[in-house]
């Protein structure tokens, strides 16, 4: 399904569910509240916004939704859960939004999801990948656009099992997404390779990585392979420091999200070769 078709269908459903019938016939726009980390994660959020704007243009050129134009109100939450919830409340109660979309970081997405479930607002989570978003912490009002972390970690576990590696080290941001990603990989890999060993687990703060210290810790554990969940600026620092110190030489690396253009392109000439990525 094309993004514009999906977006139109979702906005249509939300408008019918949340807008009084008397208001459906009005001429004003159907408003969607979009919350994201536009400054903090500009390399990802910028193209993401441009894609939405293109889809909105196509939808409105085709007659809009319920014969009304579709309008997005974009807000920056600075990557802070509390700020995101505050903005969500304002969008729904003051701006007249019929639904919420957005978020990249899982801790922010979980905060919006909890708020949406409590208030009965439809929330389309664009990028938060923590499995708990739609599993343990899920609710009937929250939907996710992306494939799950469980699925992507499972694919990498299959590749890791086929590599013949037995000793693994992991590095992941210490918040919900990173924790879910490591847990899913370990479960999937041990089901395929029962004698696999995890010799190190590194948990840098998200966007606060001390790459030198993390590389040293990984090297000391002498793994056969590394499972990486860092992304964005943390990934860039890890790749640079690990490359300079030879961490990846002769080792398999299995890495979540690192093949996506938003995270791969900024690495430029430092982009690692031979990694298995999603």
Residue ranges and their predicted role:
Residues 91, 95-104, 124-126, 169-172, ...:
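Periplasmic-binding protein-like
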Residues 242-278:
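Extracellular/periplasmic periplasmic-binding protein-like sensory domains
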Residues 41-50, 176-181:
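Glycine- and acidic-residue-enriched helix-capping/strand-helix junction motifs
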Residues 28-31, 67-71, 94-99, 118-122, ...:
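Loop/turn elements at helix/coil->beta-strand transitions in domains of secreted/extracellular proteins
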């Amino acid at each position: 399904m094309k993004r514009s078709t999906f977006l139109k269908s979702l906005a249509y459903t939300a408008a019918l569910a949340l807008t009084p019938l008397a208001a459906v016939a009005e001429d004003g726009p159907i408003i969607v509240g979009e919350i994201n980390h536009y400054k903090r994660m500009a390399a990802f959020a910028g193209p993401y916004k441009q894609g939405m704007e293109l889809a909105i243009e196509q939808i409105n050129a085709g007659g809009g939704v319920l014969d009304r134009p579709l309008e997005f109100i974009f807000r920056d939450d600075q990557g802070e859960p509390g700020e995101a919830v505050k903005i969500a409340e304002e969008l729904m109660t003051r701006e007249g939004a019929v639904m919420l979309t957005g978020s990249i970081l899982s801790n922010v997405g979980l905060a919006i999801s909890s708020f949406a479930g409590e208030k009965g607002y439809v929330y389309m989570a664009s990028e938060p990948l923590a499995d708990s978003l739609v599993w343990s912490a899920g609710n009937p009002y929250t939907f996710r656009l992306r494939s799950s972390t469980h699925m992507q970690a499972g694919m990498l576990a299959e590749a890791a099992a086929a590599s013949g590696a037995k000793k693994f080290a992991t590095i992941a941001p210490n918040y919900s997404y990173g924790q879910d990603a490591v847990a899913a990989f370990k479960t999937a890999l041990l089901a395929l390779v029962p004698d696999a060993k995890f010799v190190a687990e590194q948990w840098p703060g998200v966007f606060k990585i001390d790459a030198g210290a993390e590389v040293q810790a990984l090297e000391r554990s002498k793994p056969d392979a590394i499972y990486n969940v860092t992304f964005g600026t943390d990934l860039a620092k890890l790749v640079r420091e690990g490359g300079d110190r030879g961490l990846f030489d002769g080792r398999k690396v299995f890495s979540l999200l690192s093949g996506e253009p938003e995270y791969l392109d900024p690495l430029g000439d430092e982009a690692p070769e031979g990694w298995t990525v999603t």
